[in-house]
């Protein structure tokens, strides 16, 4: 349709290719010159390239090193301490926080400059570097090695089109290269070139087998030049092997594992040496459409169990909901029957010439038909009726009528139903009739299933509160009291009214929450029974509900539907309902891969999604021409009325192919369809292979798919099975017509259909493809019904007859286009929500990484201290409450403020803030000195004792009487800084521990917020805008809480006192026991409890693995028993150091409130 535009302005893709072909020619010129070099001379080219890159960025890196050294040598605001506890000067120049920030900004600008210079340099090196790779491939011809479990003989030298694709990949674009065109080899050239920067690059694949196979297959090419290559999927998380894989010049891995490692690094790692990844420099994503489009709506989530979470609601409601669904089925059958009867009466009225009565009867029949489709759209009797001439048009006409004027007539349609189903939007909503029915079944009040209008209730109690306040003011005016007493009484009485108001509000919210949970559970169960089918959306294996990926047909291991849907499916299938989980960390693949400095990808089908790639990822798609012309015969679709007719036709066609020995691959959209066709072929005695989610085995799958091109082979596979594996055919099969592809239905996305078609006709081989479609297929039923119904009616199609018509093919394409646009809109909307979380994630992960590595961490504690003091003073100053301020400072920061009311008023609010801050920092400096000096002395003694056998790290246990944490200090750093390293370690650990705890809670709050935010649209508010505002408020509160808790912990915490220094030979320390813990803030010489074991009892990787719920759980450590309720214990007041004895039941309350610790 747009050919005349292309003729006028030129094809933009051709224009891009025309720019690149001269570069390909230049590469080939270099290639000819390189053939005379020896192997060592060829290898030397790599060293020369690296040297050129180093030279180009030498000045930039020198300045960056200067900045690093300057920041490192600058003394801290707290200052290291000498042996006498006094602050000493370091060798470097002192820097203010503003000066530090300026240096950090300069460093960031230099980093951007580094990227630009390197890109320019790589572009200059590209022709010769790519030629080096091509020459290396030529020299490898005939060599053999193992790859993917099989011995392979190297027989590839890049074609010009592969070099063209490689240039596109280096430019940070998407190369669309058809199946069999050698994408794997094309990626080698840009990976080699970008690895020369020394910052590593990654190739991301879709499954473990391909990641490991491609590492082994392409590895010798890189290794010829001394580059290291590894695969992350070979190793378990948090292991040295996986860390080394990321340290390699070129790293292969799956999108899931690489994404999860990012989350692990930012969630469970507590020491810099435990970090796996080293940055996001350059990545090529293989099958990029699968990763960034198909999986875009499914975030990577690391989750753990929710404590004390019960799932009884789903069990209790399952049977009542199943009865409700059965009642709806009966109702829908009655609507179908009524429709037929009304249409028969209509025919009689028409025969009698009563056109008005006939129209009324048709309208009534349309309403019954529409109600049936709203009540249970997948009902078989309904589907059979809709396939009859004129029925789909009648349903569509009725739907259009009731959807007019913002669907104001829809309540009339749904009032006769127990619940309404919107299959397109995948929603189910219970009606008033349904609420009455389920309340009757459960013998409960109907009100328990109706959500109160919270806004109205809140407004009502707030009005009542305001009336009481007004009455209070009037009553006080009449009392004979002084102005001061009147104001005090007013404030006290008003405070009581406020408490009463808050309690009433809390009751309203609790009532809403309880009912909302129940209604939500019912709606999720209704979805499970009506919209989700076993062996289509999910399978049940080994007593578990497992999700089937609609795009690949594979089981999505470890994934669960959110918002209670998975629990509802487990209840429906009567398997064990797994405990609900809470999110510890999550990221969408969209946002993860947008972090890379440069990103590119390759696939056989990207052009149809070019708009989305450009809009969301800023990635252009370049279609690379094939090495040989495509000879595959893509036949028109065959359309049948019913699925049964379609499946029978597919089996007959398979028999026809099989009889003459031509291999055939049948693509299916679900497990159920693949097994239906398989059973029929078994009855016909035709041997075949089946690949679906129930046989999820990537390596065997790839082998079966690879053999699908052999003579007489019949393979049934769900969508995308074996993607990334070529189906090669023999000369004998070529003579038979090549591989035949039969699609059992059209997918929602044209791209998935093109991928299936692309399995045949690789590298100019013959082949053919054809899709079999029925009007009962979901795509046709939901999105192509109106136009198809008109065509059917006009053609008078009989049952069993194949439908072929240009309009049908256009309708299919139009239906697919509708779904693609809808899915794109959903992904964009999802991204709007996730962008909110992503911006918060970036802040929190940056703060966590800075605490972990010490980079830019200096001064954060004092910044948080100042903000916390500001908040405290603001809270108390307006009320003149100096006593409250002193109490809060003593409780949270463990020091007493000496200030009288006169000074409090005279200084003003800002003055009080500055004064309190000065007092706090003086106290904190002294506390740090009191901790550092004895720690330094202990280490010196230990070093003298051990000599050359001195360990690298020590572990010190701290407690504030309530929380216990373990700080890890570097011995050399501690000795160099006179023990100050232990204070830095305490701050780092406090920050990490608090961030992890608060971030997990914050994610749960965001999940809860997101669940109900869509309802805001009924109040004519944009849910995304509302989500952004409330999420920001929650995030601000969280950041304030993190600051307060970190400051409080580092101010109050002291080292655990012990009589012995534990060394390596004594084995790991027991877990901290608060029964034996003791804090000491002001002792000049506390006896340190140091664990000098080289790995702290758990190993560097083991410590992170223990925190990570995705790693197999280790045996827990036993903790000492808690004292009996009436057992007497000794506790210490942390503010003044005094000890006292009391019963544990009283002591426990004091310790939990803070400021007290258990001594014995």
Swiss-Prot record:
What are the BP-aspect GO terms?
intracellular protein transmembrane transport; protein import; protein targeting; protein transport by the Sec complex
By its UniProt entry, which SUPFAM superfamilies does this protein fall under? Helical scaffold and wing domains of SecA, P-loop containing nucleoside triphosphate hydrolases, Pre-protein crosslinking domain of SecA
Q: Which GO terms describe its molecular function?
A: ATP binding; protein-exporting ATPase activity
GO cellular component, alphabetical, reads: cell envelope Sec protein transport complex; cytosol; plasma membrane
Instruction: Read off the SMART domains from this record.
Output: SecA_DEAD, SecA_PP_bind
Catalytically driven reaction(s)? ATP + H2O + cellular proteinSide 1 = ADP + phosphate + cellular proteinSide 2
Self-association state and partner proteins as the record states: Monomer and homodimer. Part of the essential Sec protein translocation apparatus which comprises SecA, SecYEG and auxiliary proteins SecDF. Other proteins may also be involved.
List the protein's name: Protein translocase subunit SecA
